[in-house]
Amino acid sequence: MIELTKKITDTVALEKIDPARLKTLSLPLDARIKSRQKVQLTSGEGVGLFLERGTLLRGGDVLTNADGVLVKVLAANETVSTIVCSDALMLTKVAYHLGNRHVPLQIETGFVRYQHDHVLDDMVRQLPGADTCVDVQVEQAPFEPEAGAYQQGGGHSHGHAHSHSHEKPHSHTHNH
């Protein structure tokens, strides 16, 4: 079994790759957020992913190993809800309400997309003003959500931790 251990991030190195050398791996988002797993190339050949923890794979990424095997990642089609709206303000409101529910979103000109959830579809349809322009389409399409403000590669992460205190500010200086 081929073991893939590294995502190539050097843009110069990526530009030098002969596309004919690339094998392909098609994965939905839920698989592209796992750094250690067994998967199959589109050719059917089994491979193991042993990537740095927290690595998010995006369509177009190239993986390699010590033997120089090159594998291009494709974002697989999966069941998604695509919200299409010609009114930019209404589409912004849709994105706001979905974001308030911490739903990973793919945001593009004219549409937003999320992993299909009929409850969220109904919520979007019931937003004030949605009946005038919002079209909820359940379809098979690649899903590439926004990375988020605190994430380098995107996806879902719990690596950033911080604490909050509700104590009143006070001085730590003492006069002795």
UniProtKB/Swiss-Prot annotation:
NCBIfam families named in the record: PRK13261.1-1 (NF009751)
Chief location of this protein within or outside the cell: cytoplasm
Cell compartment(s), UniProt: Cytoplasm
Gene giving rise to this polypeptide: ureE
Record's keyword annotation contains Chaperone: yes
Location of the region described as Disordered in the Swiss-Prot/TrEMBL record: 147-176
Family classification: Belongs to the UreE family.
Protein name as it appears in the record: Urease accessory protein UreE
Annotated organism of origin: Alcanivorax borkumensis (strain ATCC 700651 / DSM 11573 / NCIMB 13689 / SK2)
